Each structure stands twice: as C-alpha cells, then as structure tokens.
Amino acid sequence: MLFRSGNHFGYEGMQLTEPAQFTEYPKGGFYDWHMDADVNGQFEPPVRKISMTILLSNPSEFEGGDLEFMTEGNKPPQLLQGQAIFFCSMIRHRVNKVKKGVRRSLVMWFGGPPFK
C-alpha cells in the first residue's frame, strides 16, 4: 500500500520516519487542526510526506472522534476496525471530540528527502 500511496503522491524513496504512535482518545478527547508535515524545516530528514491512521477501535464502541480533513467537500471517512487511511502529511486534519467511549488508533508517518 505504501508504494502505491507514494507513487500516487509522486514521492520516491519512502521509508518509515519514526516509531508508530498509539493514540487513545477517551470521552472529551480530541486533536485540533494540524499538519503532520514539517513545513518550517525544523526537523532533520527524512521528512514526513505520507501519514497513515489505522482505526483500532470498533466504531460501535465510541461516538464522535471523527477524523476530518480540511478539504473542499470535507466528509469524514467512515473507517471500520482495522482499516487504514493514507493521506498527504501536508493536509490539515483533526480528530473531533469523542462524545462516548474510547477511540484508539495507530498512526505512522512515511517520508524521504526534503522537498525541493
């Protein structure tokens, strides 16, 4: 999947940039709008270019906690437990406030040399 995603976005030499991150959002938990990419050039290469989120929780076990993208026609993806979504790390995104239950996910970043 990573190679297809990298080719789709036109990136070469993709690699895992850091260890995977387990995230847990209990009731009231959220993560506001942000980009995963280092747009200010503060981090050493490899730079994040593709982000991936795997939903670990069963969607029936929590309410809210939608992964949203700041794009035209913003419609949150409806992931099932164990499904992954890949997206460009420069796209602003957030996790809405969890209203009930706990949302768990695994997040990974893939990158390569700095953009030219």
Q: What are these regions, as identified by a protein language model?
A:
Residues 1-84, 90-116:
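Fe(II)/2-oxoglutarate oxygenase catalytic core
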